[in-house]
Amino acid sequence: MDRIGQAKPLFGSRGGSHPLARLTDQRESYGPHVVEELVRGLSGLHVVADLGAGSGRDLGIVRRLHPLARLIAVESGTEYAKGLAQKADEVYVANIERDALPLEDGQADLIMANQVLEHTKEIFWIFHEVFRSLKVGGHFLFGVPNVCSLHNRFLMAIGRQPTQHKLCSAHVRPFSRKDTLAFLNACVGDGYELTEFRGAQFYPFPARLSRPLANALPTFAFTIFFLIRKTADYDGGFATYPARARLETNFWSGNVATCSQYWDPPANSSNNSVDRDHILHSEPR
């Protein structure tokens, strides 16, 4: 058996040690300038929530541009939550992959999630809660690494793994513009519209070149930002989609207990041991 040697990192290297990685400004990946530009273009922001608020950088942008907005920070642990008390009006520690958001139905004007969704499996539940919490006309602004960035396309062409989606990393979901919109279309159809799509960071170029390149070619950028607007009442489409599509993964669907109605295993199924409740039930196993 041939032994495969350890692959050396390329572009997105460990600790930024690769010479090409040193050229880039890692702060560009979070696109604070993109967040500011998109938030500046919104009006009537009364309730704003940030999922995975981290250091509170993006909430600080909202506070500066919309000083009267009520800011809600949601974090998974107490490490960041303590510091967020100075940045947000309310701070909650919650598991966004399992818990309901601390928002009433149709309460939020804007929900943000920057460099968060790629860390999650339960994407259907998260979007279910976001769309439940947004008012009609409210916006969801999220930034995610782009699996179709220019440097990732090059890496894939030579048989290397995309830097943002390695098995030995914290990222569990890849995103691209086309696939993200296909996901939204499948789950809510005409219930949303994409109002803005932007790029940030352009590997392996320094910031002075990265920004204009990301602006001109966002689908090739390292990070992609979506600003979507909720255009209709939400009917639970995200939570029920895994069952309707018969996805054979035990996705969490909260208290949406109607999921199993969509599952009708064929009578001649060769796998008589299939437990549809285990696959689709709303309760954890």
Feature-to-residue mapping (PLM):
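Conserved N-terminal segment of class I S-adenosyl-L-methionine
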Residues: 1-104, 110-112, 124-127, 142, ...
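Short, hinge-like loop/turn segments at secondary-structure boundaries
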Residues: 89-92, 157-161, 214
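Short catalytic micro-motifs in class I SAM-dependent methyltransferases
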Residues: 114-119
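Short glycine-dipeptide loop
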Residues: 134-139
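Acceptor-substrate binding/catalytic loop of class I
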Residues: 163-179
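Conserved catalytic loop of SAM-dependent methyltransferase domains
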Residues: 181, 186-223
